[in-house]
């Protein structure tokens, strides 16, 4: 037991004598006393030479000494780790007078900004938002809109077909049909959404956004339509714009018109299409065209956005270039 006391005291003094605050030095002492060939390990191995009667008592004393030395080692390690932490914190002191790093907030996409502006304007006039499926049937995308099979207008749509009956919608007009099937006049709706056409260049992309308006009532007329669009375009562009209506052709409206605004360069710029709902379209949904009339408006969201913000390339909206998108925050 004298050897045990001597080893314990020697370990304690060795730990107390350390001055370099080095964890490596503590580890060296731990290995010296508790490693595979350490002093306490050898004492435990020597228990086989102790008589069976004395072995439990001797083993208990060795374990008690081991625990005492281990506790001193642990305490010294905690002390030095705390010193090292305080020194590191002192070197990394934070100057609270410096301005903090600002969190960069995202913003709405310019297309979303335009959709919100359009929806907000027409909501004040009693129009409600309706949505429909982007995978549409041939009936809702064409037939019900007075565009039967083999109609030449179908060729203008550059349609993505899944099979003979299903397609990616080329216009949001199908929402008008679905709405008129489930609602009775008077009807005031707007249908924002994605549409798809097989075209890609500076002014066309395979996917883009449209907003359609539909108004059906007993006294809907073209004069109302013109006044509504005059007010909308001046509110949207925040200018007293010169607006003109040109005769045009759409299978689902009669008469039909395209609407232009005078640009800052003195040239007319096309912004949307419109017209009175064709009687055949009303008949297809069970509405009597002799009792009710209606008008419809279709506008390309990207087109409006390009004109409002002077964007020259439609593809910029889909490239996710932060230098471009940050301009709209």
Curated annotation (Swiss-Prot):
Catalytic activities: tRNA(Phe) + L-phenylalanine + ATP = L-phenylalanyl-tRNA(Phe) + AMP + diphosphate + H(+)
Domain of life: Bacteria
GO molecular function per UniProt: ATP binding; magnesium ion binding; phenylalanine-tRNA ligase activity; tRNA binding
Class of enzymatic activity (EC top level): ligase
GO biological process: phenylalanyl-tRNA aminoacylation
Annotated residues for binding of Mg(2+): 254
Intracellular or extracellular location(s): Cytoplasm
EC number(s) per entry: 6.1.1.20
Gene Ontology, cellular component aspect: cytoplasm
Primary location group: cytoplasm
InterPro entries: aa-tRNA-synth_II, aa-tRNA-synth_II/BPL/LPL, Phe-tRNA-synth_IIc_asu, Phe-tRNA_ligase_II_N, Phe_tRNA_ligase_alpha1_bac, Phenylalanyl-tRNA_Synthase, tRNA-bd_arm
Pfam families from the UniProt entry: Phe_tRNA-synt_N, tRNA-synt_2d
Cofactor note: Binds 2 magnesium ions per tetramer.
Cofactor requirements of the protein: Mg(2+)
UniProt keyword annotations, A-Z: Aminoacyl-tRNA synthetase, ATP-binding, Cytoplasm, Ligase, Magnesium, Metal-binding, Nucleotide-binding, Protein biosynthesis
HAMAP family: Phe_tRNA_synth_alpha1
Membership in a protein family: Belongs to the class-II aminoacyl-tRNA synthetase family. Phe-tRNA synthetase alpha subunit type 1 subfamily.
Assembly with partners or alone: Tetramer of two alpha and two beta subunits.
Protein name: Phenylalanine--tRNA ligase alpha subunit
Organism of derivation: Histophilus somni (strain 129Pt)
């Amino acid at each position: 037991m004298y050897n045990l006391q001597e080893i314990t005291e020697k370990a304690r003094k060795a730990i107390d004598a350390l001055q370099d605050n080095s964890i490596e030095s503590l580890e060296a002492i731990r290995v010296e006393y508790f490693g595979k060939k350490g002093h306490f390990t050898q004492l435990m191995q020597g228990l086989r030479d102790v008589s069976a009667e004395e072995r439990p008592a001797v083993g208990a004393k060795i374990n008690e000494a081991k625990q005492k030395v281990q506790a001193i080692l642990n305490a010294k390690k905690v002390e030095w780790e705390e010193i090292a932490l305080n020194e590191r914190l002192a070197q990394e002191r934070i100057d609270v007078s410096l301005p903090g790093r600002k969190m960069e907030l995202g913003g709405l996409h310019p297309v979303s900004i335009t959709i919100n502006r359009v929806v907000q304007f027409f909501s004040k006039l009693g129009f409600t938002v309706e949505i429909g499926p982007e995978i549409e049937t041939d009936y809702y995308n064409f037939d019900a809109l007075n565009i039967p099979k083999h109609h030449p207008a179908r060729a203008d749509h550059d349609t993505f077909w899944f099979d003979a009956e299903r397609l990616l919608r080329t216009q949001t007009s199908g929402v008008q049909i679905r709405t008129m099937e489930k609602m009775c006049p008077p009807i005031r709706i707007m249908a924002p959404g994605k549409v798809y056409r097989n075209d890609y260049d500076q002014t066309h992309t395979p996917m883009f956004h449209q907003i359609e308006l539909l108004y059906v009532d007993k006294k809907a007329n073209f004069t109302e339509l013109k006044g509504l669009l005059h007010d909308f375009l001046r509110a949207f562009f925040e200018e007293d714009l010169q607006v003109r209506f040109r005769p045009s052709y759409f299978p689902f409206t009669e008469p039909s018109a395209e609407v232009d605004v005078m640009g800052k360069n003195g040239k007319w710029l096309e912004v949307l299409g419109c017209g009175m709902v064709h009687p055949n379209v009303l008949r297809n949904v069970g509405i009597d065209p002799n009792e009710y009339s209606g008008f419809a408006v279709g506008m390309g969201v990207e087109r409006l956005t390009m004109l409002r913000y002077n964007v020259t390339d439609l593809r910029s909206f889909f490239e996710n270039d932060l230098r471009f998108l940050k301009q709209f925050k």
